[in-house]
Amino acid sequence: MGQCLRYQMHWEDLEEYQALTFLTRNEILCIHDSFLKLCPPGKYYKEATLTVDQVSSLPALRVNPFRDRICRVFSHNNVFSFEDVLGMASVFSEQACPSLKIEYAFRIYDFNENGFIDEEDLQRIILRLLNSDDMSEDLLTDLTSHVLNESDLDNDNMLSFSEFEHAMAKSPDFMNSFRIHFWGC
């Protein structure tokens, strides 16, 4: 691991990042400091990028069963700019609004990226959440059917964004569970 050039963040940049995210000034500065430690040597932080492997190995993501999907959704061409990292941290912050969290949760859970959370996606979500590869096919089918019975309002065996949004809005635990504290900030 290298180190970026240790430029102080300009006050104007800090204010802009604070206006564009749900992060506090201190959180942005903490993320900036951590980013500097991980990025390639000799690069200015605005020009530097981190690899998906670097980001997915962060303690906050290393144990997350959806780390590969999170990285796919927030990275660009499998690399993270400083602003990509800020965007990811902002969405997973406590202050992020429910609609933003729901939008990104949908994108993360849409494994096949077809614009719906279908049976295949639901099965992958269930297996990851339960950390189980040896679940019986019958139980997996029952759990998937139960989720669809509760949330699939038009009975097409998949969840549109609006159906997913409706289900998450009724879930009291969603806002608390869709949080990640990055960088130890």
UniProtKB/Swiss-Prot annotation:
Presence of keyword Disulfide bond: no
Tissue-specificity statement: Isoform 1 and isoform 2 are expressed in testis.
Record's keyword terms, sorted: Calcium, Magnesium, Metal-binding, Repeat
Binding sites annotated in the UniProt record for Ca(2+) 2: 152, 154, 156, 158, 163
CDD domains registered for this protein in UniProt: EFh (cd00051)
Top-level taxon of origin: Eukaryota
Binding-site positions, Ca(2+) 1: 110, 112, 114, 121
One function term, GO molecular function aspect: magnesium ion binding
Domain EF-hand: 97-132, 147-174
Keyword Hydrolase: no
Miscellaneous comment: The binding of either calcium or magnesium may significantly increases the structural stability of the protein in comparison to apo-CIB (calcium- and magnesium-free form).
PANTHER family found in the cross-reference section: CALCIUM AND INTEGRIN BINDING FAMILY MEMBER 2, CALCIUM AND INTEGRIN-BINDING FAMILY MEMBER 4
Quaternary organization: Interacts with ITGA2B (via C-terminus cytoplasmic tail region); the interaction is stabilized/increased in a calcium- and magnesium-dependent manner.
Protein name according to UniProt: Calcium and integrin-binding family member 4
Protein source organism: Ovis aries
